[in-house]
Amino acid sequence: MKKGYRNAIFVVVYSKKENKIEYLVLKRKHHWTGWEFPKGGININEKKEHAVKREVMEETGLKVLGVKKFNYSGKYRYKKKFVDRKGLIGQSFSLYAAKVKKGKVKVSKREHSRYKWLEFEKAVKKVRFNNQKKSLRIVNKWLSER
């Protein structure tokens, strides 16, 4: 069987009210434990912007008000094999930001256990992996310049 990378999106979810920006982070419980932002695979023939809106709704219950694509992508290898990822050795991703209205989050119980709205400095310390930290920095820089 040919092994490959799952085509996916990273979505930095944010809420902006006046000059206050907060980022949504989720506590992962499926495959590994730690904090992250919404992410997920892109379905066959699905446009990436649609995948962004779908993943945010599935993982948080929040409606996306706006989407921004960034010129940042990458890939990483899984540290172990997953039953639900047969034939895949890792994930390739493209970065997006999704603006939402801050509200009560309905986390996907299968994947996450909790959520937090955090300002940038706390959010960047909270997320686990360097590619997620870099993603937050990119989005925060863009938002700070607007």
List where the protein language model places each region:
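Short, charged/polar surface micro-motifs in flexible loops or helix N-caps
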Residues: K17-N19, H31-W32, N43, K75-Y78, ...
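Short aromatic/basic micro-patch
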Residues: E36, G90, W117
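Conserved N-terminal beta-strand and adjoining loop/helix that marks the start
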Residues: M1-Y23
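NUDIX/MutT-family hydrolases
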Residues: S94-K99, K104-R137
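Conserved Nudix-box catalytic region and its N-terminal flanking loop in Nudix hydrolases
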Residues: K20-K63
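Active-site segment of metal-dependent pyrophosphate-handling enzymes
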Residues: G61-K104
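Short, well-ordered beta-strand micro-motif
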Residues: V13-S15, K27, L95-K99
